[in-house]
Amino acid sequence: MVSAAYDHMVAIVIVGMIFVATVVALPAISYSNMATVDQQQLRNTAYSVFDAMLLDVGSPSNWGSNLPFDPNKVEKFGLAYADPFSKFVLDSDKVQRLDPANPGVIEYDRVVDLLNLEEYGFQLSFYRPFSVNWTLDITNTVVRFSTTVTRSEDGTPIPNAEVRVTFMVTASKLPKQDDGDFISEKYDPKTYYTNVTGSCAGFLSTNLGEYNIDYAVAIMHITVAGLSTTVLAQNANPITNLIKINTFGDTITLSFPDNLNDTNSERRIKEIDAYDFKNLMRLFKAGDVNPPEVKITKGSGYEYWSISFPGLRAVNPSVLLFALQVTLKGIGRTLVLIAGPFSFGDSEKVFAFGPDPQSENPIAIMRRLVVISDMTYISQLAFWREQA
């Protein structure tokens, strides 16, 4: 009898414990399931949006190449190149329209409206397929460089990467007053390969007579297992903000950046060269064509300069290199080298559009390989639901 009563008491306690556990656990399980469903819905939406960005050409199909650019005339957003056989190949003109420093930019809010993403936020970024770190030093007659190629994911060195290097220098002689006191020279490319540490180094010895090197760049076209990227090494990083370079179709546009660097003086364009993965091709040389000289200043009517080169879009150069004559504080009159249209000096991240993700919101991350100007990049979409 006592044993039976004891058994009933134990059973009641066990049932009570199960009931309490169920009451506590079911909401947690339900909440977990709801969170999982919400995250899956977020990923599905991000996937659809990412494909729309990368696979759709938008409307009109050449919206990034139209000059003058009016974002209100863009009826549908998409970055794809207008070719049915070019899946995940992006139009560089459209990508450049995402640059906030571009004189013809499409704003983030406008893209949100075109994609009907009023309840969501996103950031679209482009990265190199691998990391590249470099150094470049000059003497009066010699340019020396070194570079290291590593995996972006974990920093593992990449041996046997092909590094094709094309040099260009500017040089001067005293008294640095006349145009003849400044010259620019480009050189045939040289090919190197990284060792077991992912590194390689080389040098260029010049013979410029009475001229001494002032500035130098090394355009490094790096190929790993069929994937390639271009990095531009230079001996003076601060000069990169002297001018803003954009291309749209066959047209090159130069403008002043928002944050001027070192000088507010005029920029005189002395030479323009285009890099096509093999060589530097001269497009413009001051005095050779009309107009004989080109300049941009902060004066009214001179803040922008554009010139068209028929066939430029077909050539699709990865780098445009400009020799600019400027007057720098503490240096005086000099001839510098500026590259564009993208940021080629960064080792990893090349471009980002949109605000940084908010840490309190669940974020879906999507990545795809894309091609821009015949170079492979990792595109990344960070996608989240905005707080109500």
Located regions from the model:
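N-terminal single-pass transmembrane signal-anchor helix
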Residues: M1-I29
